Amino acid sequence: RQQQFEKCLVQTKSFPCRWAPDAGLGYGEPVFNFYGQFPYWIGEIFRILKLSVLDSVKANFILTIVTSSIAIYFLARKFWSNTGATISAIFYAYAPYRAVDIWVRGALPESLAFIFFPLILLFIKEFISTNKNKYLFWLILSLAGLTLTHNLSLLIFAPFAIVWTLFWWWQSNRSKHLIYDLTSAGLASLLLSAFYLLPVIFESSLVTLNQTTSGYYDFHLHYATLRQLFLSTFWGFGGSTWGPNDTMSFAVGHMHWIVAMILVVFVLIKKRNKEILFFISLGLFAIFLTHGKSDFIWNLVKPMAFIQFPWRFLTMSTLFLSLGIGAIYKFIPKILTSVLLCLLLILNVGVFHPDIWRDIS
């Protein structure tokens, strides 16, 4: 896609780019009319710096890991100390699903979306707390960035962002103008990305979108099992198949769910830091949406069919569990915190590699 995006810019000189010239057996397809363009604009920056197309994509993936870790660090810093924020950042970077996105699926847009998730939550929280318009400005840009990066990630993230907003609004003075301002920010972000959204909305009837929600892409066929989510140590470079015999991992992360459950026990016993329960509850609900028991929700909310794969909600479990886990340093000795981080790296760092190393010159 990076190569086709560049070819579209150079050959057609169109802005924004709509057409992938060589797709569709050489006839071309309106790929960038429906897929977010922002990842490929970033890729063009690396191309300007004289990186090859392949190296530009690699650099983009590296950027997603580094920048997303920094983003959640600043979010977690609003709740925990520097130590807690660092813990959250490390858990966010080394969640198994992050490796799936990069090394198994090669899902650049979804990987890039991991940057915007914590930024949006941060700016919502800061605006509600301070009522400063600068946070509203950055919120608009972040929402537009997520929209232009991966519209399915926006669909997945939006309900959680709304719950996040209402929770912190309820904790504040509950001023109605805060809701009005945040709603206006959401609308402004849609206007900012209208050059992409309007064609998606009004030209979808010109393509066969029904094929994206039926057959192999029917979400009913891709629920994860409890074993896959919590117990399995399987790692593969295949894909999501019908039924439980998938050839890729849907693991939440052993350290992620175990530490999260330990935190819940500590919070319930000590009866403090209730926001930890909020973060972990959102993460657990996201995990629930990956499982077949959530089928009634998927059938009720029709637009969810476009998400295709319920395990995509591992993006949200990774986000909120990592955020909550940052508080673990409050309840255990410093040496145990270091042990937990070492265990995380030992268990997960080994999956951050490709299936086959190829020497391409």
Predicted regions located by residue number:
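Membrane-embedded transmembrane-helix bundle of lipid-linked glycan/lipid transferases
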Residues: 1-360
